[in-house]
From Swiss-Prot:
The organism of origin for this protein: Histophilus somni (strain 129Pt) (Haemophilus somnus)
Keywords from the UniProt entry: Cell cycle, Cell division, Cell inner membrane, Cell membrane, Membrane, Transmembrane, Transmembrane helix
Membrane spanning stretches: 5-25
GO cellular component: cell division site; plasma membrane
Protein name: Cell division protein ZipA
Task of the protein: Essential cell division protein that stabilizes the FtsZ protofilaments by cross-linking them and that serves as a cytoplasmic membrane anchor for the Z ring. Also required for the recruitment to the septal ring of downstream cell division proteins.
Taxonomy, superkingdom: Bacteria
Main subcellular location: membrane
Membrane protein topology class: Single-pass type I membrane protein
Family from the record: Belongs to the ZipA family.
HAMAP family named in the record: ZipA
InterPro entries recorded: Cell_div_ZipA, ZipA_FtsZ-bd_C, ZipA_FtsZ-bd_C_sf
SUPFAM superfamilies: Cell-division protein ZipA, C-terminal domain
Length: 335
């Protein structure tokens, strides 16, 4: 017998041995698995369904809570949606920065199309953005937020007021805010919105401002700022600034807005990676759509959250620290 035949025979024998060993190993593993399954204690079998039941209960509770929120939102805005369903939609991006650190001039033209914006929202933590005004007013904790009455923050404000804010104020007044306008037009069939616009036309409206400024020699990164605004339910819109709507619907009224305090007051999303600003301004019209007190509380909560996330300071219209007394004074203006 030649060498080739011997090698072929040895190869076949080796292959048969490998196949037999694989089959034997597979059977051993299956046998061990079934032996282990028989050793499970009765306690372990009982614990698993109990844990599953707890998870199911928690999931069911969360599902019920979300369902209640959706039903509340639908009840609140179903009538408005029905009225507006026959009207054409005008796509818009709202805002041409309305703010300065001390003086901000805002005019309200008689007519302009309703703003419609593309929704950009990434919820995180508690979903305040999707809650209705009534739910938010009940659930909001007025004591939460930044401890803005601390001595450390007061020292930061004193430094900021003497440098960054003063410089930005001059630039804003000279180049931008004397020319900026923002309009809010009521839905034609919405009685409450009509009353707001009628007061605006009669000259009885005003704007309530809050500022969030960065620490000395620092600034807010565009990526971090836009991420925080998106998480709070703001939508980038007309005039290249952000707006907070009633229910994140592109047809719902605007409650308050956010703009850059640096000229020209806008947010350049095309170069957001290189965008920096020393601060932002939050402003709302008074009277506003719905409950003005609830809207103002929501704006204050948003300002505190932004300051906390970006290591900034909340400042009043008079460039003073926004403490508990200042918050009471602000709420008194709409009560």
């Amino acid at each position: 017998m030649d060498l080739n035949a011997i090698l072929i025979i040895l190869g076949v024998i080796a292959l048969i041995i490998l196949v037999a060993h694989g089959i034997w190993s597979n059977r051993c593993e299956k046998s061990q698995y079934f032996e282990n399954s028989k050793n499970f204690t009765r306690e372990a079998r009982i614990r698993e369904p109990q844990e599953n039941q707890q998870y199911q209960t928690a999931d069911q509770s969360q599902s019920d809570f979300q369902r209640n929120l959706l039903e509340t939102d639908n009840d609140c805005f179903s009538s408005e949606s029905a009225h507006n369903s026959h009207q054409p939609l005008y796509h818009y991006s709202e805002q041409s920065a309305v703010q300065s650190v001390d003086q901000i001039k805002i005019r309200l033209p008689d007519s302009e199309p309703n703003y419609v914006m593309q929704e950009r929202f990434s919820p995180k933590h508690t979903d305040y953005a999707s809650m209705s005004i009534e739910e938010l007013e009940k659930s909001i904790d007025l004591d939460e937020g930044i401890n803005s009455s601390s001595q450390h923050l007061r020292q930061e404000l004193a430094q900021i007021s003497g440098q960054s804010i003063a410089d930005d104020k001059v630039n804003i007044e000279e180049h931008m805010f004397t020319e900026s306008t923002i309009s809010f037009v009521e839905p034609q069939t919405n009685t409450e919105s009509q009353q707001v616009v009628e007061k605006t036309k009669s000259g009885n409206s005003s704007f309530i401002m809050l500022y969030v400024v960065a620490s000395e020699n620092q600034g807010f990164s565009g990526l971090q700022l836009t991420k925080t605004l998106d998480e709070l339910g703001f939508i980038f819109g007309k005039k290249q600034i952000y707006h907070r709507h009633v229910d994140l619907s592109i047809t719902s009224p605007v409650l308050f807005s956010v703009a850059n305090i640096e000229q020209p007051g806008t947010f350049d999303l095309t170069n957001i990676a290189d965008f920096y600003t020393v601060g932002i301004a939050l402003f709302m019209q008074s009277p506003s759509y719905g409950n003005a007190t609830a809207n103002l509380r929501m704006m204050i909560r948003a300002a505190k959250t932004i300051a906390q996330d970006l290591d900034g300071v909340v400042v009043t219209e008079q460039q003073e620290i926004f403490d508990e007394q200042a918050e009471r004074d602000y709420l008194a203006r709409v009560s």
